[in-house]
A protein has these predicted regions:
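Compositionally biased terminal segments of proteins
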Residues: 1-160
Length: 160
């Protein structure tokens, strides 16, 4: 993980580009877990779900204009690298479209972003955790995220 990568700058640039494109979107993944649970959480990238019907070529152009470099193309996602070094994954999944519609605008470090609801984030994490093809370490992280989202939040004043 690149310690100099700037998640907030990457997120700001991605959100601005998607808004200018008119692409419906919402923050998902570890960043969303941190925002929703109130517990900062290490994550290897920044994940943003975009409506599955978006024009991918227009999206690639918009993110490139915002300073992101395309690093991978997959059936349901595009991977980018922000100029700060932060990896960004844009996810296209028809099952996420209703979740994007239900996403709520929240303030995160002075940035107004749409984040999927806690209930939808738990559903996403449950789906991922039970995927037999998912790496075990990721599935375990998904299960821990579910518990955080359900309120099992550590008290900074509690002992071991």
């Amino acid at each position: 993980m690149d310690e100099s990568a700037d998640k907030l700058a990457a997120l700001a640039d991605v959100v601005r580009a998607l808004d200018q494109l008119g692409a419906s979107h919402a923050v998902v993944g570890g960043v969303a877990v941190g925002i929703r649970s109130g517990v900062p959480r290490a994550t290897i990238d920044t994940d943003v779900a975009v409506r599955s019907t978006v024009d991918r070529h227009a999206l690639i152009d918009a993110l490139a204009a915002a300073g992101l470099r395309l690093t991978g193309t997959f059936a349901h996602s595009l991977n980018f690298r922000h100029s700060s070094g932060e990896p960004v994954q844009i996810v296209f999944d028809p099952e996420f479209d209703p979740m994007i519609d239900r996403a709520e605008p929240l303030d995160a470090e002075g940035l107004r972003i749409r984040v999927v609801t806690t209930a939808d984030l738990i559903a996403m994490k449950q789906r991922a955790a039970t995927d037999p093809a998912r790496r075990r370490s990721k599935a375990l992280r998904d299960q821990a995220d579910i518990e955080l989202l359900r309120g099992d939040v550590p008290d900074p004043d509690e002992g071991w």
